[in-house]
Swiss-Prot record:
This is Large ribosomal subunit protein uL18B. Residues 251-296 are annotated as: Disordered. Keywords: Cytoplasm, Nucleus, Ribonucleoprotein, Ribosomal protein, RNA-binding, rRNA-binding. SUPFAM superfamilies: Translational machinery components. It is found in: Cytoplasm; Nucleus, Nucleolus. The keyword Cytoplasm applies. Component of the ribosome, a large ribonucleoprotein complex responsible for the synthesis of proteins in the cell. The small ribosomal subunit (SSU) binds messenger RNAs (mRNAs) and translates the encoded message by selecting cognate aminoacyl-transfer RNA (tRNA) molecules. The large subunit (LSU) contains the ribosomal catalytic site termed the peptidyl transferase center (PTC), which catalyzes the formation of peptide bonds, thereby polymerizing the amino acids delivered by tRNAs into a polypeptide chain. GO terms for biological process: ribosomal large subunit assembly; translation. One of its GO terms (cellular component) is cytosolic large ribosomal subunit. Pfam families: Ribosomal_L18_c, Ribosomal_L5e. The lineage of its organism: Eukaryota, Metazoa, Chordata, Craniata, Vertebrata. Component of the large ribosomal subunit (LSU). Part of a LSU subcomplex, the 5S RNP which is composed of the 5S RNA, RPL5 and RPL11. The keyword Ribosomal protein applies.
Length: 296
């Protein structure tokens, strides 16, 4: 069949059906969402949990959610902007920060359900493949599925850094090593040492050293926030190690105290009857004084 030109006549517009709003806005991939949301028919009311990862210009958002007719229900959330509390003050959108955010989400969720002591995950970070297994006589491992949204799932993407952090934190998420940094598509081999370097930001440390030697002005421009916070290339690994330990020690979110808003009044308050009478008396007295001055 050859190419058929679409004739946009009255019948075309009469029968035209618009796509879903979030598809029109380019926010939701409904083909993927349908498969992530629909639960097995023999599991009845059991929610199908998703680990949602979104990377913005200044933040990394990680959430555990499940779908309901009225909308998605968020069970737990963690953000990269919480990392300064654990000592990571700069580079809040790199691979190492994504790993920390995923780890924070996992530890916070397990703490919420009282499973943090049962499923501790992988405490020593090696970068190698690790899968959580259910413990006999205890509740099963918390299972969820990665929701990367419209992100291109290329090898080394930050989304997989958050995934690795969550798995090392004790969540059971189906995955393989094919999308982690260190996987070679030609030889089909995975090098966990390369992955470990990315988790501890050693790829950034190497680039910092290289740029400092070659072009100091470019280094000062690109790593201005690192210089401002006194973060050197040699300190990065220790910073992230301390952050991982701090997250495991206390993953609980601290609520900020609510600020009392002082109400501002933009119009004048109504006068009482006494005030109105007094105002009239003052105006009358002022008018009479002015008259007397004019006469004299």
């Amino acid at each position: 069949m050859g190419f058929v030109k679409v004739v946009k006549n009255k019948a075309y517009f009469k029968r035209y059906q618009v796509k879903f709003r979030r598809r029109r806005e380019g926010k939701t991939d409904y083909y993927a969402r349908k498969r992530l949301v629909i639960q097995d028919k023999n599991k009845y009311n059991t929610p199908k949990y998703r680990m949602i990862v979104r990377v913005t210009n200044r933040d990394i958002i990680c959430q555990i959610a499940y779908a309901r007719i009225e909308g998605d229900m968020i069970v737990c959330a963690a953000y990269a902007h919480e990392l300064p509390k654990y000592g990571v003050k700069v580079g809040l959108t790199n691979y190492a920060a994504a790993y920390c955010t995923g780890l924070l989400l996992a530890r916070r969720l397990l703490n919420k359900f009282g499973l943090d002591k049962v499923y501790e995950g992988q405490v020593e970070v090696t970068g190698d493949e690790y899968n959580v297994e259910s413990v006999d006589g205890e509740p099963g491992a918390f299972t969820c599925y990665l929701d990367a949204g419209l992100t291109r799932t290329t090898t080394g993407n930050k989304v997989f850094g958050a995934l690795k952090g969550a798995v090392d934190g004790g969540l059971s998420i189906p995955h393989s090593t094919k999308r982690f940094p260190g996987y070679d598509s030609e030889s089909k081999e995975f090098n966990p040492e390369v992955h470990r370097k990315h988790i501890f930001a050693q790829n950034i440390a190497e680039y910092m050293r290289l740029l400092m030697e070659e072009d100091e002005d470019a280094y000062k421009k690109q790593f201005s926030q690192y210089i401002k916070n006194g973060v050197a290339a040699d300190q990065l690994e220790d910073i992230y190690k301390k952050a991982h330990a701090g997250i495991r020690e206390n993953p609980v979110h601290e609520k900020k105290p609510k600020k009392e808003v002082k109400k501002k009044r933009w119009n004048r308050a109504k006068l009482s009857l006494e005030q109105k009478k007094d105002r009239v008396a003052q105006k009358k007295a002022s008018f009479l004084r002015a008259q007397e001055k004019a006469d004299s």
